[in-house]
């Protein structure tokens, strides 16, 4: 009986070494730009992957024959648009290498806009959504607070330098609303971001940009509506998502967090680099 148990364990270990590798990533706690600078920040950021590690891990995994697929949980804490764009590009390149990609989320923007989360999801082959979730496509708007009136009421004085009309960072302190150039710059930014989201939705659904823009403007959508409109591919819970991913990967498939994969590959490369010849 003991021998049989040991034999089973050894067989499972062999399968883990030779079976397909499924990388997983959880982005619901956000993503970190740089390593934490102090102990408290490090503790608070323990569940937040570093952007550089994610990008480098995906780059390594593209060329790794052992890696079969990638499954990512999206939603929760918001990620900045610039980071989302980098992640979208990296996942698109990973997918184009021939490996399967699956995104899933409990919701994409429940009670808040989910444009960035859904834009990231469009980089994947398949999108799963929890049956109680939403796809928060709401169109894009940008806003800015101005403090000139409050500072005047408080009697606070300040000195601000400003060189050009489009350098408008100081406008929050010096103006009570948008200047012409500042409004123009912000409108161009909003138009560019909306164009990227529209193009991503149009490409994924294989529809004209005008139809994609209509879908964005008419949101948000509950899960059943999103499925009917093909904004998501399936409704289900985590266990159903992973069952499909494992079945698609084949016998012996096993999971590994992308962060651990990145660290192990980096360590292996350093060992080869410094190994005496």
Where are these regions (language model features)?
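Extended, domain-scale alpha-helical bundle/helix-rich regions
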Residues: 217-224
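Short acidic-hydrophobic, aromatic-tinged amphipathic segments that line or gate anion-handling sites
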Residues: 128-129, 232-238
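Small-residue-centered hinge/linker elements
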Residues: 1-205, 246-277
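Secondary-structure end/capping motifs
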Residues: 201-215
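Residue-level recognition of oxygen-bearing side chains
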Residues: 146, 221, 240
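A glycine-rich, coil/turn loop motif that links secondary-structure elements
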Residues: 110-112, 214-217
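A ligand-binding cleft/hinge motif common to bilobed small-molecule-binding domains
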Residues: 239-247
């Amino acid at each position: 009986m003991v021998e049989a148990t040991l034999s089973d364990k050894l067989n499972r270990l062999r399968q883990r070494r030779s079976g397909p590798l499924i990388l997983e990533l959880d982005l619901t706690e956000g993503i970190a730009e740089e390593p934490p600078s102090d102990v408290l920040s490090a503790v608070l950021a323990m569940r937040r992957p570093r952007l550089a590690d994610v990008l480098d891990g995906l780059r390594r995994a593209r060329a790794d024959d052992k890696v079969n697929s990638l499954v990512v949980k999206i939603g929760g804490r918001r990620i900045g648009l610039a980071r989302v764009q980098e992640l979208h590009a990296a996942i698109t390149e990973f997918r184009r290498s021939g490996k399967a990609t699956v995104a899933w989320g409990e919701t994409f923007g429940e009670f808040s806009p989910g444009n960035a989360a859904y834009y990231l999801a469009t980089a994947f082959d398949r999108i799963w959504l929890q049956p109680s979730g939403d796809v928060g496509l709401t169109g894009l708007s940008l806003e800015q607070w101005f403090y000139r009136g409050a500072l005047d009421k408080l009697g606070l004085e300040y000195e601000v330098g400003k060189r050009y009309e489009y350098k408008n960072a100081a406008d929050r302190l010096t103006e009570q609303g948008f200047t012409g150039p500042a409004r123009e710059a912000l409108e161009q930014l909003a138009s560019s971001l909306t164009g990227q989201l529209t193009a991503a939705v149009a490409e994924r659904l294989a529809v004209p940009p005008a139809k994609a823009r209509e879908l964005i403007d008419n949101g948000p959508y509950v899960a059943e509506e999103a499925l009917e409109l093909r904004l998501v591919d399936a409704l289900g819970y985590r266990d159903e998502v992973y069952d499909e991913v494992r079945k698609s990967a084949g016998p012996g498939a096993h999971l590994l967090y992308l962060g651990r994969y990145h660290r192990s590959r980096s360590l292996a490369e350093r060992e080869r680099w410094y190994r005496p010849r």
